[in-house]
Amino acid sequence: MLLLAVFCSLSAPAWADENTLSGNFLFNVISSSEPHREAIKGLLRGRRGLPSWVRNMVTRGDYVAIASVEVSVDGKPMQLFSACEAGRCADSSIKVLFSADGKRAVLDVRDKKLGGTTLGDPTPAEASVLLKDK
């Protein structure tokens, strides 16, 4: 019984961290969370003029990603990811903003050859987060 109590007390922080919005990587989240995956697929489905690495980001993780950060948008916690094309980070990058439950996503794409576009009809507050430092 004592061993079980020790195990549970040591494991509790790990369980608490599972739901954190910071420190996650985009491909891992898309691969493991159906709401996140479906939200991204919905944004990308049928879109033309996107870099191939962005169109394929759901099935292939061949891009460079920075760990997510939690941001507050209109008082609500959201998860912000940044990623770029391997070998072309200065020329082709994205920012993705997910609701805490992963069901809503907005995406900003910046590509030197193809230009920029924002998908998902972001609110003004969401757009300001996506376009910050651009």
Functional labels for PLM-detected ranges:
Residues 3-4, 14:
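Cleavable N-terminal signal peptides
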Residues 6-7, 111:
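An N-terminal domain-start capping segment
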Residues 17-41, 109-134:
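C-terminal partner/receptor-binding element of secreted or periplasmic proteins
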Residues 9-13:
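N-terminal signal peptide c-region/cleavage motif recognized by signal peptidases
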Residues 41-105:
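Mature extracytoplasmic domains of secretory-pathway proteins
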Residues 3, 21-23, 59:
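A general marker of short, structured functional hotspots
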Residues 1-2, 8, 19, 129:
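Intrinsic-disorder/low-complexity peptide segments enriched for small residues
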